[in-house]
A protein has these predicted regions:
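SAM-dependent nucleic-acid methyltransferase catalytic core
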Residues: 3-34, 38, 78, 84-193, ...
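Conserved S-adenosyl-L-methionine
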Residues: 38-104
């Protein structure tokens, strides 16, 4: 990511960079123009760690791909996208229009998300409230003092309605990322976007922990070395020395 930001300026595309209603630490909306040249002539874009999915949604909306796979092991993220792509999106939008954020409900929703008994609809709504009203969209964070500035019902519901209009071309999954990568790799018409949690601060930012950076590096390099010519793999990371070691030793 750091290298992309510091690279030679690229021509701005007409892709919509703000389709997602989610705010995400490490989101790639600002890097869409830099990433676009690496995604050409592919039918399906697979997001192994989808999060807010700003890149995948922009590609689908622009007709650059014909199918989008949104995968996230975080059950809150999964429930949100599942509801947005189902007929229950209308009920979610009703909840959004009726809600006015206050700290009391923020903390109550944050606590309820820990329960395994929530319906997908409630989980999706609570998650959206926390995501929009917390610092940087971090699920475990405290609410921002200006919560209402981030909660704009009309804008949120319009984005959700827009995404739902593309739902025939979206598949939502709740799989282990490395299992999904291995499954999707064999189709040369796929581009698999691998954007794992930050190495340095991932535990502070995401409720679902991911410590398998070495195993991920081994999987990626093994697939590319032993079985070239299959899906394209697009990998983004925070620039850490350990990454250079992992990918150099596995090259």
């Amino acid at each position: 990511q750091s290298k992309l930001k510091n690279s030679t300026p690229v021509q701005k595309s007409k892709l919509k960079k703000r389709l997602s209603p989610l705010r995400y630490p490490g989101g790639k909306s600002k890097l869409i123009d830099q990433l676009l040249p690496y995604i050409q002539d592919k039918e399906c874009f697979v997001e192994a760690f989808c999060g807010g999915s700003s890149l995948g949604l922009a590609l689908l909306d622009a007709g650059k791909i014909h199918k989008l796979v949104l995968n996230d092991l975080d059950r809150n993220v999964y429930a949100f996208w599942k509801i947005v792509c189902s007929n229950q999106y209308k009920e979610l939008n009703d909840k959004i229009l009726e809600y006015s954020p206050i700290k009391e409900t923020y903390f109550a929703y944050q606590e309820r998300l820990k329960s395994s008994d929530l319906s997908d609809l409630d989980r999706a709504f609570y998650f959206l409230v926390i995501n929009r009203c917390s610092f940087s969209g971090i699920q475990m964070a405290n609410p921002k003092s200006d919560m209402k500035d981030r909660w704009i019902p009309k804008s949120l519901t319009e984005r959700i309605k827009k995404i739902h209009s593309m739902s025939d071309y979206i598949e939502v999954r709740n799989n282990d990322a490395m299992e999904l990568i291995e499954e999707m790799y064999w189709n040369p018409k796929n581009c698999i976007f691998i954007d794992p949690p930050y190495i340095e601060k991932g535990d502070q930012l995401y409720p679902v922990k991911f410590h398998l950076h070495q195993e991920l590096a081994e999987l990626i390099t093994d697939l590319l070395r032993e079985f070239p010519g299959c899906a394209d793999l697009l990998l983004t990371y925070d620039d850490q020395e350990i990454l250079h070691q992992l990918y150099n030793q596995n090259h």
